[in-house]
Amino acid sequence: MTFQVELVSPEAITYSGEAEMVIARTLEGGDIAFQPGHVPFIGVLAVWSVEVIRPDGDRDVFAVHRGFVQVAGTKISVLSDVSEKSSEIDVERAQQAKDNAEQKLSQNDEDIEAVDALARAELRLQVAGV
């Protein structure tokens, strides 16, 4: 049994297709796995990965930078500020962003923007397999 999944950001639809399971991390409930027949749900996403397990067993992993997940009937929608498929992440750019954030934090460890930038860069690198 499958359901329809869409990952959408302001720039693009990064995934649209069938899936057997979606795994995400919410701010309120931690990691959660959605399968067909899941009760209706709306949650706030953390800066973390979203994993889509397709009917053929293959997995697609996305770096998601905050947003919302909604389960309604046979459809799951992930709406996020940024959604990047693992194979499309620019590793060099992510490493540079990480280095820049670490440099800013070495000068001011309370710089909230640098803390957020570091979390996003580390997520991109993790999802890209670095």
Predicted feature locations:
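Compact, glycine-rich, soluble single-domain proteins
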Residues: 6-95
